[in-house]
């Protein structure tokens, strides 16, 4: 009888220990997930642009450039999900969109940062908008999946698994999308903002190239134009600046 009690006491002690360990593991996991969500939300909010339509009537002729001209790195294959684009020309109103805190990148020296965020925009041209149905189809074609924070993400695996390589948010604050079967046909936006964190999983240059290709493909499909973080036309010179930033950050992280 006493032996049976001892067994029950041992079982009880083991049960308590297991429950305590389970609680500690759950608490650690919850804190980790919460930290990741907060960090991602901070980055997203910092680099989502705010639309402020201007009365400025001056138009700028925008000439798109071939992919190979924008990003020269022939040893990296293009994403098979994306088709090649042809050169095209659009007219967009100048200064028709403004963004928060993004212009700081141009004037603040890098000073060996350990992390930066690269931003591209796809904006509708000539005072028009991007329409929900064509935008939705284009996002899926480029491998972007609707997910965390109610925005789109390009994962390592285009089916939606693996680490996030870059993300896409609505250009209108607060940045999320409200897509559903009822409103997708009527949904419109002046543009979308794409961003990626450097360092990133895998090859940062390749991941940036994927983001650039996705931006160009969305612009082609939806009738838009690819802009830099300051809402200026994306040029080969600006692409060189982006690539230099990537090299600088990767070098800074290697040196530590």
Swiss-Prot record:
Major localization class: membrane
GO aspect biological process, one term: FtsZ-dependent cytokinesis
Residues on Periplasmic side: 1-6
Compartments in which it is found: Cell inner membrane
InterPro entries hit by this protein: Cell_div_ZipA, ZipA_FtsZ-bd_C, ZipA_FtsZ-bd_C_sf
Intervals, Cytoplasmic compartment: 28-256
Keyword presence, Amino-acid biosynthesis: no
Record's GO cellular component terms: cell division site; plasma membrane
Gene3D superfamilies per the UniProt record, alphabetical: ZipA, C-terminal FtsZ-binding domain
Transmembrane residue ranges: 7-27
Keywords assigned: Cell cycle, Cell division, Cell inner membrane, Cell membrane, Membrane, Transmembrane, Transmembrane helix
Family in the record: Belongs to the ZipA family.
Protein name, UniProt field: Cell division protein ZipA
């Amino acid at each position: 009888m006493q032996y049976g009690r001892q067994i029950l006491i041992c079982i009880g002690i083991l049960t308590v220990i297991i429950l305590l360990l389970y609680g500690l593991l759950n608490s650690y996991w919850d804190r980790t997930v919460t930290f990741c969500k907060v960090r991602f939300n901070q980055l997203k909010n910092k680099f989502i642009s705010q639309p402020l339509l201007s009365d400025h009537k001056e138009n700028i002729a925008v000439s798109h450039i071939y992919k190979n001209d924008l990003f020269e790195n022939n040893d990296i294959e293009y994403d098979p999900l994306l088709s090649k684009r042809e050169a095209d020309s659009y007219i967009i109103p100048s200064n028709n969109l403004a963004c928060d805190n993004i212009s700081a990148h141009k004037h603040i020296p890098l000073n060996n940062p350990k992390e930066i965020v690269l931003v591209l925009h796809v904006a509708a041209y000539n005072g028009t908008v991007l329409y929900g149905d064509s935008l939705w189809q284009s996002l899926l074609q480029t491998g972007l999946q609707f997910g965390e924070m109610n925005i789109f993400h390009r994962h390592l695996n285009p089916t939606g698994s693996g680490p996030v390589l870059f993300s896409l948010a609505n250009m209108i604050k607060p940045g999320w999308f409200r897509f559903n079967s009822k409103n997708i046909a009527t949904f419109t936006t002046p543009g979308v903002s794409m961003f990626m964190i450097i360092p990133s999983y895998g090859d940062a240059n390749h991941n940036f190239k994927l983001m650039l290709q996705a931006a160009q493909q969305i612009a082609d499909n939806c009738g838009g134009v690819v802009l830099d973080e300051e809402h200026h036309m994306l040029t080969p010179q600006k692409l060189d600046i982006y690539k230099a930033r990537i090299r600088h950050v990767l070098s800074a992280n290697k040196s530590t």
